[in-house]
Curated annotation (Swiss-Prot):
Transmembrane intervals: 2-17, 56-74, 79-99, 120-139, 147-167, 173-196
Molecular-function annotations in GO: phosphatidylglycerophosphatase activity
UniProt-recorded name of the protein: Phosphatidylglycerophosphatase B
Role: Catalyzes the dephosphorylation of phosphatidylglycerophosphate (PGP) to phosphatidylglycerol. Also has undecaprenyl pyrophosphate phosphatase activity, required for the biosynthesis of the lipid carrier undecaprenyl phosphate.
Residue span of region Phosphatase sequence motif II: 118-121
Cellular localization per UniProt: Cell membrane
Record's bilayer topology term: Multi-pass membrane protein
Record EC number: 3.1.3.27
Reaction(s) this enzyme catalyzes, per UniProt: a 1,2-diacyl-sn-glycero-3-phospho-(1'-sn-glycero-3'-phosphate) + H2O = a 1,2-diacyl-sn-glycero-3-phospho-(1'-sn-glycerol) + phosphate
Taxonomic source organism: Bacillus subtilis (strain 168)
Active-site residues, Swiss-Prot/TrEMBL: H121 (proton donors), H171 (nucleophile)
This protein's UniProt keywords: Cell membrane, Hydrolase, Membrane, Transmembrane, Transmembrane helix
Domain of life of the native organism: Bacteria
Cytoplasmic side: 1, 75-78, 140-146, 197-203
Amino acid sequence: MYKPVSLFLFFLILAAAIHTNAVQSADEAISKAAVLIRQPWLNEVMTGITHLGASSFLLPLIVIIGAGMFFYRKTWDGLLMLLVFGTDRLLNKVLKEWIERVRPDFAPLVHESSFSFPSGHSMNAACVYPVIAYFLVKHLPFLSKHKKMVYIIAGVIAVLVGISRVYLGVHFVTDVLGGFSLGLLLFFLVKGFDEKIKRFRQK
């Protein structure tokens, strides 16, 4: 349980730090620097990447994978994926409304209307892609042989989504880090819970 606890503590530290002048100044400096490196072709690439963390993309993806699990009589795992995604979305919404951090205002390339901390797309990506990787490795033998690579791919996708949020001007770096910490926290909780259920069934 040390990983979820560490991630939760990291999130709490970030939530407090974003109200300090030093962190806010650093966030703004990075966001301004991101604007300076923009290129038309990169704008399109980052806009495409950011959709990988959108709920409108991830929910159908989870439903499709969940349907496949149901077909192969892995109903519990499919339901667990939906449950963790729902928890992810609810937790993010509640925290944004509670913390009420205003988004950066440095020529954003996409429109967002909710509050900024923690980043929802980053939280989605850091939670959902590792969870998908976990269940794919669990049920597909040919992927279980390449477990490390599957998790690396999931991690790379999450990191790219986080970078895209800063590049597009809709989040500060600390928003992304906050989203990552909570997303990974949920992943480790789901993984640990599923492994305990598995051990219980084997008794």
